[in-house]
Amino acid sequence: MKKLISALLTLALVIAVALSAASCILKIGGGNNGGNNGGNNGGNNGGNGGGGNNGGSTEPPDTENYIYLVKDGAAEFQFITGGNLDPLVYSAFTTMKEYFSELGIETTRAEDYKSGSVSDCEILLGDNLMFRENCAVDVHTVGDLGYVIKTVGDRVVIVPGSPDIAATAVNKLLSALEVRDDGKTVRVPRSLSETVHTEYELKSIALSGYDISLWSLYAAPSDNDVRALATAFRDTLYKSAGAWLEFADKPGDYVISFTAATEEETGGYGFLVSISGKKITIGCSVSSLFAETYSEFMNEVFLSGAESVSLPDGYSWSRDVTKLYYSDFGAVGDGVTDDFLAIKAAHARANQTGQRVYATPGATYYIGAHPDSISVKTDTVWTGAEFIFDDRGIDSANSSRNYEVFKIESDYASATISDIGSLRAGQKNIGVSLGYPALVYLRWSGAKKYIRYGANQDNGQDTQEIILVDADGNVDPSTPILWDYDVITQAVAYRADVKGITLTGGTVTTRANAADVTNYYRRGIAVYRSNTVITGVKHYITDEGNTGAPYMGFFGVYNSTNVEINSCVMTGHKVYNSGTYDTYSSLSNDVRWVDCVQSQSTTSQAFRNQRVAWGVHASNYSKNLSMTGCTLSRFDAHKGCWNATIKDSTIGIGITIIGGGDLVIENVTRYGSVFLTLREDYGATWDGDIHIKNCRLENAGSTAYVIQANYVLSNGTGHWFGYKCTLAKSISVDGFTVASTSSSPKIYVLSPVVRGAASTYDPSTDTVNPYTLPTSVTVRNVTGGTVSLTNSSCNAIKNIPYKKEQ
């Protein structure tokens, strides 16, 4: 038994020695690629490595010729990348990480060495600070489809020319790695170095005689859109020619400057590339078309397929991007084809891009009935073109009658103001800061104003007006709050457009409707935008028959401030059942009619008596209206005007107005026996001062009135108009001539004034609806007849303080 046990122990010892020897032989044999006889480079090095002491250790690392990324199954390195990786670069990084994960190796990544720890051994992927500061490799020299793989110290650098090539470069590195010891060792030769350059069709670029490599780029850092284009320019040149341009801090020599230029700076073209010595400018005045036109330039100049591009000093490339034409969108302009949709499409495009819109000179654009309007938000030029607005088929049931043909609109949507509690007349601030200047509409439904008297008597309208406020809610002194608002039923802010626009030229003929109704038609050009000018537009009317609906006004202004209608031709409409107008303003401020004329006679008595044409002008709820240098049939303010000026004009049918503030009439000729009428149906009121200077009344009869103001009494008091009425605070007449058909006309400054009044009527004792009289009337330099204050029998009127000077 003892012999058997001894024999077994001896056998176990022999087996143990044999296993130990076998293990030593396997370790000396090397890694995956080695084998007993060496094999390839990795196997040779493994096979040739020395054995460990006591036959139990592996070969020593060959750090002179290799970088060891993994030792003893643990990573000796970390990945270094930039912070915001392109998705393609991140995908390439993931490929590497998964490669090591499959070997059972956990790896780490730092997003740049300044935000993490620095290790002695790293794989640098792409552009990052460690790469820039420690690796003498210019990534841009290889082009967008090239790459560099090399070792620098104990770092492996992978530099793709662009994200598109990152995966290719990473796979190339992975194929060069040597994996040994069943994945416990991974190394890469220090001699690894591979550079692949992109082959380009465009091989050279010279600008003003200087190679592209000398140039850099500039775009204002604050202008994101322009800087994005400059970046796109850089990337395009890099991908097409391998030329990389850095950004400069400011414009200067050898700098290509991208700029949002003015139209003048682009020579009127809107887009201009210009080379002057060592400076290049690429500018566009239409920001929305910068990218599109820049692309056209690049395709024509740099991406045409040429092997070389040389742009000399003085070179320029331009495109007129400032305008587009109706014909570009299919408008025919033959006077027969309905061009409404094509014209609408042209303006829709321009409203997006900011371009001017042009009609083709000589074209006639026909526009029929459409329940829609053409929105205009950019300068528009109709010079030399004609339009036909055909209203003949539009009856009262056709909704097209409610639409303007052209609607000049704001760039900003109106905004409801909900946090104003109440307001008082004369209040200086509305208590709300809008952050921008605006025209503000106010309405209170709890009190009625302008309760009309007479043939068209009504129950009045809600208290309402417009005021101009600044960004802090301060009320502009020229548009004071006129009424008390115990409750604000509605308040709307119409932001004042910074950029003004102009509609220029063209002739429009309205073929009038024949509807036998009193419903008003629109069908014109309406301004709903502040800072707008309509100039040189001529409007005529044909096809007026025995019936027809009235028109609101071909030239309309609504909810706007600073609007001018200049050098336009207007036509009075035939009168049927209601007043009908060719120009109109409502709830607007600072509306000016300048050098406008009427196509018909404004002076013929027969013409006026036959009601061939109604007064051409009307307004409601407006402030600071003016008419200068015009020859028109009428200036008319229905529901109030605050401040009005008429100068250097001829007014045929009449000046009829109510309101307040300053009424200035200077160097104006009026035809008829009454120069100025304060409208009886709204209380013959002007709550302010009236100034008349150097004016003339033509074709007067035997009795002429400077001012006609009829305040109607009933049962000893006035009609309630929703407000107390005032003839005027003061009246000044300085220079007034009457040309009469009578040999000895009588001139009265005031008409009888109070209709139905007994001689004893005294406004001061009328405690219900008194008619406040002026505190002074001053007259000087009146010629053409015998002048007196009034022919009224009312003592209160006769006793108005009156001073006559010659």
Regions found by a protein language model. Name each.
Residues 4-23:
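Sec-dependent N-terminal signal peptides of Gram-positive bacterial secreted proteins and lipoproteins
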Residues 25-62:
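Ser/Thr/Gly/Pro-rich low-complexity, disordered linker/stalk segments of secreted
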Residues 112, 238, 242-249, 303-806:
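Extracellular/periplasmic carbohydrate-active domains that bind, remodel
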Residues 7, 51-53, 130, 438-440:
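Extreme N-terminal leader/targeting regions
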Residues 59-322:
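Solvent-exposed alpha-helical segments and adjacent loops
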Residues 17, 27-30, 107:
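Intrinsic disorder/low-complexity segments, especially N-terminal tails and targeting/processing regions
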